From Swiss-Prot:
Cross-referenced PANTHER family: COPROHEME DECARBOXYLASE (PTHR36843:SF1), HEME-DEPENDENT PEROXIDASE YWFI-RELATED (PTHR36843)
Protein name: Chlorite dismutase
Reactions performed catalytically: chloride + O2 = chlorite
Residues in coiled coil: none
Signal peptide span: 1-31
Family: Belongs to the chlorite dismutase family.
Amino acid sequence: MTNLSIHNFKLSLVAAVIGSAMVMTSSPVAAQQAMQPMQSMKIERGTILTQPGVFGVFTMFKLRPDWNKVPVAERKGAAEEVKKLIEKHKDNVLVDLYLTRGLETNSDFFFRINAYDLAKAQTFMREFRSTTVGKNADVFETLVGVTKPLNYISKDKSPGLNAGLSSATYSGPAPRYVIVIPVKKNAEWWNMSPEERLKEMEVHTTPTLAYLVNVKRKLYHSTGLDDTDFITYFETDDLTAFNNLMLSLAQVKENKFHVRWGSPTTLGTIHSPEDVIKALAD
């Protein structure tokens, strides 16, 4: 495979998740309402992960070499320390922690924080840096985005594909793997008409429908909040299916609108936060 084809191959994956989940509010009033922090709402996983107006913070960490010099008792106690911190903030943020050690060069673990109020996520991450493991790790990458309601592949604009997306439910085993890919579009994309972008999204969504039973996906918008436009988040138990998804999208020409795809692409495994820290303490 040539360098160019490899590049095109990588740039094409996010078409589906952007096609199926790229969103913006339909009016300024709706946008303002969607973005209002819902401070009075209790954090419930099944709710916050399906709502618009939710901020997502992804922070990748690399443990320092001196971590191995920390006394074993302190390293073992770090898991309980992080568990207590998560419990302290459970009414303000939803915390997921993933293990990347052994799969990535530049990180050992990363957080995904979902919050109605971005400042609450910032407070959690600031306090994490004061924990035993937080004081012995350096930030490699931070990505910030927000969820929005469907815009392109919606019932009114693309009813056929919307029905296909709605009926394609994940049916595989509990996902063991997580992949995070940041994406940035070029000026040509943003200067296209909404109708032109809709057409592109329909073309790119079609070949992905067969893989939605194997791959979960979620989209965060980050234009103006970060140096990228989208954060694409995937969960799967079948990395071969995920690879085949990429191969199917390699034939789609939408990658000409990307100026960033990955850099980094982060692959990790899914565990409880406590188990991630325990694994790093060994």
